[in-house]
Amino acid sequence: MFKTLYSRIAIYAITVILFSALMSFLFTNIYYHFHLKASNDAKIMRTLKEAREYERTQKPKPLDTYLKHLGQMNYQIMTVNEHGTKHFYGETFRKNTISQSAIKKVLNGEDYHGIKNKPYAFFVTGFFDNETDNTVGIQFKTDDGALAVFMRPDIGKTFSEFRIFLAVLITLLLIISISLVIASTYSIIKPVTALKNATTRIMKGDFSTPIKQTRHDEIGTLQSRFNTMRQNLGQVDQMRQHFVQNVSHEIKTPLTHLQRLLTQLELTQNEEEKQLCINEMFEITNQVSELTKELLLLSELDNASHLTFNDNVHLNTLIKDIIRHEQFRTDEKDLVLFTELEDLYFRGNERLLHQAFNNLIINAMKYAPQNSMINITLTSTNHLIIFNIENDGSIAEEDAKHIFDRFYKLSDESSSNGLGLAITQSIIHLHHGSITLTSDDKTQFIVKLFI
């Protein structure tokens, strides 16, 4: 029954309508029994006493004719004489339930308040209870002795048309309400069903089909955010495919080269050529090893929940150590390094920060022209540390857009695997910092870390 949200909402709403109708009936019944019964009893008793007074003063003859006339005025009347003989006027009572003791009391001159004293019944409205005990009664004096007269309004006749009207009204109310509930439930569920179908498409790898935003409420917001999520997942999937292709290419190329060198090594007899092959194989294995290390580091950065950032890093010392370690690169290209480093500390992950600054410094040395200068500065302003590294030469605008993409290379001939700057950016972002590139006559990388 509740396998779909549509049936669940529709059944809940219909249940609420029916339950509300039932509770309304019960509370109305309670209200009648505890607030209206007494006043209803008093009004009918007053009418009956006025009828008795009229009969006493005007002496309409005979009494039977007078009571028949009252019966024709939509009253139900029962009379009982001292011998127990009963006569009925107007519509017939459904049940004759009045007790003999009540009849005797009325014959003895006591008033009978059966309407007011009618016992409360949970699912029965006493107002419509067509029984002789649900009446008021008084004593009439006749030439033949005392006569007990019991009377109640003929509700069935008085409200017959109204009851039909009320029944039609309630029936139409329920039919229209339930129909509208079903229709409105469908309008609510329709976009949810569309979302469900869209998630099924995404599970099957279809990220290209959007869903139409049809509303401006919470469901409309959900539709909008779902489309955003779909686009992001599509981008992630494209990046994943691109990443797998690049990794496959980066691994396949050196392996193919190694296979060729092994074949060449097996066939050559020249010792010098053999040594060249071996040296080249060592170089290729080192490249593959570096690629593996950087891929593992990227995986670590993508799942950074286990990383800690509590090291008190002396940035001045860290940068100087990198420059000293890479001194051979400056000697090879006759580079001149100008450094201006403030004595600054930063709380973070020292291993990762060393990797980030190392990548930036090595890149600057690697792509700087022969006999050129590299400027490195480390300064601080209001709650901000700024690292700036600048070398001669420029990067094309199209290349600059993708410089931080994984596996992006400025040149196919480059020995780089295109992961260094992507790793650097990830590390800086994990430290809640930023890294930007500007390039015109010179190329400049700017790292900002918040203290």
From Swiss-Prot:
Residues 246-451 form the Histidine kinase domain. It is a multi-pass membrane protein. Autophosphorylated. The keyword Phosphoprotein applies. Its EC number is 2.7.13.3. Member of the two-component regulatory system HssS/HssR involved in intracellular heme homeostasis and tempering of staphylococcal virulence. HssS functions as a heme sensor histidine kinase which is autophosphorylated at a histidine residue and transfers its phosphate group to an aspartate residue of HssR. HssR/HssS activates the expression of HrtAB, an efflux pump, in response to extracellular heme, hemin, hemoglobin or blood. This is Heme sensor protein HssS. The lineage of its organism: Bacteria, Bacillati, Bacillota, Bacilli, Bacillales. The gene is hssS.
